[in-house]
Every structure is written in C-alpha cells, then in structure tokens.
Amino acid sequence: MGSREALLGKALWALTERTLVIAAARWEAERPAGALHTTGTGRHLNAIVSRSPGLRRLLDEEPALTLRLLTDPRGRVQTGIVTFVEALLRRDMVEFGLVPLIEPDALAYALVRLGESFLYADVLAARQPDVATANRLQQALVEGT
C-alpha cells in the first residue's frame, strides 16, 4: 500500500489538482474581457489555499512533513502547480500577447515559490500568512505593474 508519507503526498496532489481546476473555473466565470488567466486564477488559488482548514490543520500538526510534501521540487505537488501555472502563462502569451521578462517555466516556478512563501509564512518564517501581498507581487511579476 505504501508509506504514510507517500499516501499523504498522493492525497495532497489529488486535492491540489481539484483546487487548480476550481480556481481556474471561478476566475473564468468572472474574468473581464482581456484579463489574464494567470493572475486571476492565481488569486483564486491563493484564496482557496489560505482558507483550507484541512491544510491549516496539517501544517499545524505536522509542519515539516507537510511543507516537504507541498514544496519539494521533486515532489508531485509543487511540480504539478508549476506546470499548471506555466500553461496559464503560455495561454496568456498566445491569447493576449503577454511577453514575460523571463522564460515562462522560470516565471511559473518563481510565482509558485512566492506564493508558498506568503501562504505558508507562519510555518516557514514565523510570520503571518499574507495573501494580499502574495497576490500583488505575483501580479507585478506577470504584468510588470
């Protein structure tokens, strides 16, 4: 059946996949014409993650394990989110002529790591999670504003 850590990693990825789909759908339902997919979906993703009582409980009870599963660059969760964000960036490049200052794969990775830094700030750096700042910084990286 597998180790507890492997099972928890699979469960976290399954929840993450669902959350990515929900965040994208919520943004698409309200997206104004011409608004980028990346930043709006990212705002919804940050909001959903920051309000997840199950994730907060897991971070409180098993911070080291949870952070390792969520942020390991060789793990499924971070890799999957980066791939998803890169696809959004590439879609914005095609649909809206977005010209990122750095390669889309590097920008996607930076956006995800930035989000992790602010969403999990309480565990990583004894700071309060700050979704609003994460949103502003991510938007600035994507849109240059």
Segments from the language model and where they lie:
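Amphipathic alpha-helical packing segments from all-alpha helical-bundle domains
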Residues: V21, R57, T66-G97, D105-V112
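C-terminal peripheral helix-coil segments that are non-catalytic and often amphipathic
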Residues: A47, T83-L98, A108-T145
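An amphipathic alpha-helix adjacent to DNA-recognition modules
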Residues: M1-A24, R43
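Helical hydrophobic small-molecule/effector-binding pocket
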Residues: L36-E61, G75-T79, E86, A125
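Secondary-structure edge/capping motif, primarily at the C-terminal ends of alpha-helices
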Residues: A23-E30, L59, P63, F118, ...
